[in-house]
Amino acid sequence: MEASGSASWARVSKNLIERRAVKGCLLPTPSDVMDAAVMALKDATENVVSKHLFSVDRTNALSVIHTNAVPESIITTAILRDTNGEYRREYEDSAKCNLAATDLSQDGMWEVVIKSYWRYLRESSGAEVVDRGGVGNTTQSVLSVLILQSTFGKKRLSKNPFKHKGPNVSYKSNLENLRAAFTKIEKYMYYMRPNDPMTKSEDTELRLHELLAYVATCYRWLLWFMDLTDAKVLKNIDKGPVITHGPRETRPPDELVRRHLKSGPAISAGTGDALTLSTATADALIVLLRMSVSWTSHSWKSNTHGVTGAIVAAVELVTLIHHHLQYIINTIFAGYVCWLDGGVENSYLNSALRNQGRFDHFAGKLVPIMATLSWANMEKGTVMWFKYALAKSIVCHGSPTQHYLTVLDSIASKRTGAGLPPGATFGRTANFQGQFGCPPQGPLPAPPNSKTKSMFKRPGRGSVRSLKQLPASTPNMVSSATTYNAGGNTAATSGQGEEAIQIHASGELNDCIWYLNGTYSHQRSDSSSSDNSSCSSTETEYITISSTPSPTREVVYTDPLLGSDEEKDASPQPANTVSEYSSPANSGYMRPRSTLAEEIWQLRDSDYTPYMRPSRAGRPRLRLEDQTLQTLPGCKPPANSPEDNFEDTLFSSSQIYSDNAHSTFRPRARCVDDEYGLTALAALSASQAKARRVRLGTTTPTSANEATEKYTTPSSGGCIRRTLSTSESPESSPEQQERVSSL
């Protein structure tokens, strides 16, 4: 017994410790932690997203596809099954809660809209309209109404914008069709996402291009619609614009819609991967085209209530479309940007952002922009799904792919171009350090008050470790904006001349604030919001403003970007040039756009040429009689000028703009050198012609065909030819010579 027991123990004890250590030690491995994190993210995500994203049919169908593609049949099936709007359930509930928190009735919301429009019209056109003070109880209430009411309100504020019943019934039908098209597009975008955000998806990229081109087209339509509405309102109230400028959108709606339908990304590709999406965007654009006809041809009621009813209906339409478009852009920024070639440097994304920024520049006083962070606080499902998908993708790939790192690098390059300090690493970076980054290896940074600065190593990607300089302050984990500290002090300047950045802690940010003055590269005045909503931070993209206002009220202004297919226009030129703003010490400061500020076009570079030459109020245009400005064959005529020959005709702006509200303008040739005005060129031409006649002596024409003399004086650009037609010799026509000299 003892021998057998001893033999059994010897046999058992050989790998006892190994087996006990393997089976008994529960120390988690990195893979265990990653798996647990992925499962926890999945459980949290399933509670806030549509159940159709995790359906068995969708999971099985995508599991057999190894190209990270999503067939349209899967997308269409999810759209048809989502009959209750589950794709934005969380977002809609949050929006309705925000509207309910305003405690405004239908009449109160009506007052908010109409007061906001009068204030916008006064500042955009200079018309003398009565400003009845504040536009609501609080800024938050005003912004909630202007952003969410038209989409999530219980009913329309203005049901009959037109004078007759037939157009009103047709408008109601078009509005319902437009809402249905918007819902279909948003559902398509929601369910078209592939499973892997770190792998390129060609069909998803094509669909995103179609959506972004559609967004750019709609924003240009909105500018055209605002031009139409403002002109009709000024006509109905017998007011004229004081701040004169050209149309903010020169292309008519039919041309904009036709251009997208014939040469949009989905149609041009010819692959059929976005056939359903292109049909949905075409339906929405066609409805907008019908509405263009309705608002152009149908008249309003002549009484006061009829005009205000049409204004409220127009603002409701604009805010409805604008909310839909910025929903698409915010969704792309929340994660879909990872499937765009080049990330945030994608040309289609830049075009959409440029058109949104242009619309915000001209109509942002009336139609504010929702910050992406605020949108993400309402639409939690999209952000959480991308965190879950990214964690699962990292587990599968083992490390971030080069495609995903390229997208992150594009964001970092944009942040550098926005003017942030070189050492600042706000927000997201491409090195995946995060909040729990590894401790620095090497010398620690010097104290804040030290005169010397130290460098330390931090792990980099791959086998090569690089030296990077980190900021002395704690990275901001909430937003990539540079804000003011809680005490209200601005950023101080160190002895070496570098700015010390002071940031808010995450708990100090007010996430209830919707809108940021200066979301884009211009800064509007504070008339559309309370005095407590001044801008205190700058960023190129969407951010939320902090709860602490800026004590200095300094804003940063940069020139907006215009696309290659957009006509450049001059900014409004007010009658009063006295500015109420004082320039701060910052050398890069540029004044915000305001009716009392200097003209923005004066701040541009010397080689900038606007397509329309504005006329200062009270300064009459000189009518050119018996004179024409002709462009040589090498010069391109302006976009809004007739292309026929103007010889033997009178050049009059009233003939070209007979039906335009802004009839005091004339086209300005692009070939005119900005260093010389037309008056100076005319005087120079007349003086040189007179000097030439004095040298050559007086000549008398011998026939009727020789009664016309042409004096040509090339400008510095060589593109101007001035023709002077007379019925007799220049020496015998002092009136004609005096008229030319006076120019």
Curated annotation (Swiss-Prot):
Keywords assigned by UniProt, alphabetized: Activator, Host cell membrane, Host membrane, Membrane, Transcription, Transcription regulation, Virion, Virion tegument
Cellular localization per UniProt: Virion tegument; Host cell membrane
GO biological process terms held by the UniProt record: regulation of DNA-templated transcription
Topological category with respect to the lipid bilayer: Peripheral membrane protein
Polar residues biased stretches: 573-586, 697-716
A Pfam family that the UniProt record links to this protein: Herpes_UL46
Listed GO CC annotations: host cell plasma membrane; membrane; viral tegument
Major subcellular site: virion
Domain of life according to the entry: Viruses
Region (Disordered): 437-481, 522-590, 693-743
Record field: compositional bias (Low complexity): 526-552, 722-743
Family classification: Belongs to the herpesviridae HHV-1 VP11/12 protein family.
Function: Abundant tegument protein. Trans-activates the immediate early genes.
Subunit structure of this chain's protein: Interacts with VP16.
Name of this chain's protein: Tegument protein UL46 homolog
Organism: Equine herpesvirus 4 (strain 1942) (EHV-4)
